[in-house]
Design a protein with these regions (language model features):
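C-terminal alpha-helical cap of glycosyltransferases
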Residues: 125, 129, 146-166
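Conserved acidic donor-binding segment of nucleotide-sugar-dependent glycosyltransferases
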Residues: 104-105, 109-116, 125-131
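Glycosyltransferase donor-sugar binding loop
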Residues: 18-32, 50
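Nucleotide-activated donor-binding/catalytic signature segment of Leloir-type glycosyltransferases, i.e.
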Residues: 32-58
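Short hydrophobic beta-strand element within catalytic cores of glycosyltransferases
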Residues: 89-92, 102
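Acidic donor-binding loop of glycosyltransferase active sites
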Residues: 59-75, 88
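A short, well-ordered alpha-helix in the C-terminal region of glycosyltransferases
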Residues: 132-146
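A conserved mid-protein helix/loop that constitutes part of the nucleotide-sugar donor-binding site
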Residues: 1-12, 81, 117
């Protein structure tokens, strides 16, 4: 998932940055604990390495300003849909369909490379330009409306009506 890249990116970011790591890891979390220890300031990391129940997801997203998905490989990510639900802009790497669902829709920043430097730069870019948050959140709201059940039902009803008219 690229968590190692994000932890290394935190080393490059100033002390004002904090990172919430939430969710059940694939395999042992030991290697990430080591990277966090090597970062020099483990107090900047808030770690919840367990399965997150649906009823608990909200508190993690409400505590966050930004969702970062530094994936090394992926086709899509369910986390991006959850992030949109909570109107959180994203920093993602250019893998799978993330560029199309995030970058092309203007709901976040796409890193050209999955490196700590690129991820750190994108995170800083987001926080150094607060006006971008408004733009991203506005685009997320439009995307949420486009993908809403209300829109789906409206389109389906219109389609059925065209069939009935024939």
């Amino acid at each position: 998932k690229g968590l190692d890249v994000l932890i290394r990116a935190m080393r490059l970011l100033g002390p004002r940055y904090r990172l919430i790591i939430a969710g059940e890891p694939y395999g042992s979390f030991e290697k990430y604990d080591e990277l966090i220890s090597e970062s020099g300031d483990s107090s900047r990391f808030f770690i919840y390495p367990q399965y997150i129940r649906d009823s608990e997801v909200k508190k993690y997203f409400c505590a966050a300003d930004l969702t970062v998905l530094p994936y090394k490989s992926a086709t899509q990510s369910g986390i991006s849909a959850v992030s949109n639900h909570f109107e959180k802009p994203m920093v993602v790497t250019d893998v799978g369909g993330l560029k199309e669902t995030i970058g092309d829709r203007g709901t976040g920043i796409v890193c050209k490379k999955c490196t700590p430097e690129c991820v750190a730069e994108a995170i800083e870019n987001y926080f150094d330009h607060p006006e971008r948050k408004e733009e991203f959140v506005s685009n997320i709201r439009k995307e949420n409306e486009r993908l809403s059940w209300n829109r789906f039902c409206k389109n389906l009803t219109e389609f059925i009506n065209t069939l009935n008219a024939k």
